[in-house]
């Protein structure tokens, strides 16, 4: 904390300098008519704005002549001074140009995330007014940097995808590998893609009611079947982190921001502490690359009149995201709602223009997901809601340091969060200071106000029902207390609302950097008019100085949240009984009971299944979310344990011989029949003697096959 505070001092000083640069009044720029206007770039290069205004002047002059009977009207874009040698530019409506000429720089439309929706709504002729981005080598370098950062985060897993696991996620790593395996098994066997009986046999698991990422598992099924679920998990994590950053970079470039600004914003969205934290075992919260694409498609609805096509594409994208992760989509929708309300206050959002496309998108998506959603809430093994203990962020976590960040104290960080996969805040002091300066300096931009409000509201929601400071309740109610019992929202962990602040803060940084580059560019051009002898290299350096200073300030603010590699520990070895073909002689269509039974803290049997021909046999119980067996159909983690499972759990915990009574033996045999168990398997490892000897009192002496003890219990079902 002290180190972060010390670092915040130079950040604050540099931010003050940057604020002075950005707040300087820009020099007037002369138009072709001799009048002056204060130009604020809104996603267009200066040359394109000048050309558009010149064409507008020509049209006005020609039409004046026509009114006097001295000439014919001139179409927009036919200005004789424009010879067409430059790259073609989008048509700019006259209303847009007129609005630009009647505004000051401070009042001009923002050039960032919501630029498309905050400019004049509806391009003429249905033409897309977002700048078309031609990707070049510089863009590929940015994406390569994102891939390199993702490799750095996962570096301890490289070369150990099947022998190591992300241990700070407890068993989440294995759980998601199992989900990828289940999707591949369903594809290979033409089974229901929304259900699997490969764990919790014979009841099975409702995949739609779990974070099963079928939207990635199904298309990646060939990879899983060819190389295994371990490889699929690594690929999804790697491309999820890098792809999310690259998608936001693309989104910001689509809004017209310069490359350095978009690169910094994209990096923060892809590698914020929350993203790195979820990389410990939550690929559904790592693979967020569709969210900026969906947002871009929403903004396109304000730019052109192809509502049907854009609406259909929007619906398809939303549908895909639902199958990847519903909760991230819900969080984005809340963020869009907050930003939209602020823009509506400023009258910078035309809901009537967007409504047809949004309605079409909603209809397409609802048509495609109606049955899956019915299955999720009313199908086999569905449940209503699941109880979570208070899961709000500690207030100190908002400016604290995450576990996997450079120079942090892991124990101090751990004390401020639920667990290592839910460090959803931890933005650091310097980033908050810089964001505050940006909001103050650029406060007249509606999009800056909207992003600032979004960051505050998201973090306020993330505090839960009551503000807690360093583990001590303050008695101050938080915003979440107003919404925690609403349908759907009741299942959301409030700590995750802080993730909505990530793109908000990234947008603020990107807008400020872009403004710095454009501010220095305009001043450089003004200087060129009075200094014709200036060398091109010196001029280019001078024009971009403020922009690179802004990048440096942002880098200083991001330094405390630079990620370190995730912790990887060795997996328990898979018995050769499963890596070879021996298991086939003991599996005959029923289940295998792993001892101790699989649950949220011991999912080693998942590795057995994945090693044996990708879930070729089902197992008893498991790690999933399912119904609790009560009339209210509430949810719970894992299966409702039968007496035999509870007994094995107690024996394993006590590590002492326990002799079963006659009544217990009868009950345990009934449990095995209910599970339709073929074989009970106990691997040979340390501390198995108590379990083995206790099982002897229930099932008799086992057979030793390679490196496991096995009991054939098929006879109990006859």
Model-flagged regions — what are they?
Residues 148-244, 272-288, 395-412, 469-471, ...:
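Membrane-interface coil-to-helix junctions
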Residues 552-718:
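Extracytoplasmic
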Residues 146, 237-255, 260-345, 357-373, ...:
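Membrane-embedded helix bundles of polyisoprenyl
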Residues 90, 94-96, 106-111, 118-157, ...:
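Start-transfer (signal-anchor) and selected internal transmembrane alpha helices
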Residues 346-358, 435-477, 524-534, 540-544:
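Membrane-interface helix-loop-helix junctions at transmembrane boundaries of multi-pass membrane enzymes
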Residues 167-186, 354-357, 361-439, 485-498:
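Periplasmic/ER-lumenal interhelical loops and adjacent helix-loop junctions
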């Amino acid at each position: 904390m002290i180190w972060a505070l010390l670092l915040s001092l130079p950040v604050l000083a540099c931010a003050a300098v940057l604020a002075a640069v950005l707040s300087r009044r820009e020099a007037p720029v002369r138009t072709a008519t001799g009048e002056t206007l204060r130009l604020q770039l809104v996603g267009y290069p200066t040359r394109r704005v000048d050309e558009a205004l010149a064409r507008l002047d020509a049209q006005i002059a020609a039409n004046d002549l026509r009114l006097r009977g001295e000439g014919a009207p001139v179409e927009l874009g036919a200005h004789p001074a424009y010879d067409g040698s430059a790259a073609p530019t989008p048509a700019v409506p006259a209303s847009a140009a007129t609005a630009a000429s009647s505004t000051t720089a401070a009042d001009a439309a923002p050039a960032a995330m919501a630029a498309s929706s905050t400019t004049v709504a509806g391009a003429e002729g249905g033409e897309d007014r977002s700048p078309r981005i031609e990707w070049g080598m510089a863009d590929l370098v940015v994406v390569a940097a994102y891939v390199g950062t993702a490799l750095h985060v996962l570096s301890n897993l490289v070369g150990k995808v099947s022998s190591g696991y992300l241990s700070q996620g407890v068993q989440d790593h294995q759980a998601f590998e199992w989900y990828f395996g289940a999707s591949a098994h369903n594809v290979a066997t033409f089974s229901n893609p929304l259900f699997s009986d490969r764990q919790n046999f014979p009841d099975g698991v409702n995949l739609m009611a779990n974070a099963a990422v079928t939207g990635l598992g199904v298309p990646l099924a060939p990879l899983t079947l060819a190389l295994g679920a371990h490889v699929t998990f690594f690929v999804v994590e790697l491309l999820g982190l890098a792809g999310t950053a690259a998608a936001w970079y693309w989104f910001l470039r689509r809004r017209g921001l310069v490359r350095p600004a978009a690169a910094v914003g994209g990096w923060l969205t892809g590698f914020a502490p929350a993203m790195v934290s979820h990389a410990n075992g939550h690929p559904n919260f790592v693979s967020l690359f569709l969210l900026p694409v969906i947002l871009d498609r929403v903004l396109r609805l304000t730019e052109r009149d192809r509502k049907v096509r854009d609406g259909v594409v929007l619906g398809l994208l939303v549908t895909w995201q639902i199958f990847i992760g519903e909760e991230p989509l819900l969080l984005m929708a809340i963020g869009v709602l907050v930003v939209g309300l602020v823009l509506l206050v400023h009258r910078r959002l035309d809901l009537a223009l967007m409504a047809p496309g949004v309605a079409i998108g909603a209809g397409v998506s609802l048509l495609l997901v109606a049955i899956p959603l019915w299955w999720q809430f009313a199908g086999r093994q569905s449940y209503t809601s699941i109880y979570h203990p208070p899961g709000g962020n500690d207030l100190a976590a908002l400016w604290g340091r995450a576990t996997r960040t450079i120079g942090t104290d892991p124990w101090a960080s751990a004390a401020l969060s639920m667990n290592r996969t839910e460090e959803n805040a931890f933005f650091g002091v310097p980033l908050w200071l810089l964001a505050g300066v940006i909001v103050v300096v650029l406060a007249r931009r509606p999009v800056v106000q909207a992003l600032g409000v979004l960051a505050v509201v998201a973090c306020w929601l993330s505090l839960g029902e009551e503000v807690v400071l360093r583990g001590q309740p303050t008695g101050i109610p938080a915003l979440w207390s107003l919404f925690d019992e609403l349908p759907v929202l009741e299942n959301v962990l409030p700590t995750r609302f802080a993730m909505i602040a990530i793109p908000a803060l990234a947008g603020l940084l990107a807008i400020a950097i872009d403004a710095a580059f454009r501010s220095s560019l305009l001043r450089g051009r003004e200087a060129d008019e009075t200094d014709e002898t200036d060398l091109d290299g010196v001029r280019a350096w001078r024009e971009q100085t403020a922009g690179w200073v802004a990048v440096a300030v942002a880098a200083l603010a991001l330094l405390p949240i630079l990620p370190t590699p995730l912790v990887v520990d060795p997996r328990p070895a898979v018995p050769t009984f499963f890596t070879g073909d021996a298991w086939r002689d003991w599996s005959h269509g029923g289940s295998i009971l792993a001892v101790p039974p699989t649950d949220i803290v011991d999912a080693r049997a998942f590795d057995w299944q994945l090693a044996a021909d990708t879930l070729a046999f089902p197992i008893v119980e498991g790690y999933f979310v399912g119904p609790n067996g009560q009339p209210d159909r509430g949810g719970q983690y894992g299966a409702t344990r039968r007496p035999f499972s509870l007994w094995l759990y107690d024996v394993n915990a006590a590590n002492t011989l326990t002799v079963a009574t006659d009544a217990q033996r009868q009950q345990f045999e009934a449990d095995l029949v209910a599970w339709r168990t073929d074989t009970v398997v106990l691997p040979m490892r340390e501390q198995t003697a108590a379990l083995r000897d206790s099982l002897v009192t229930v099932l008799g002496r086992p057979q030793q096959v390679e490196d496991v003890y096995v009991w054939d219990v098929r006879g109990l079902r006859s």
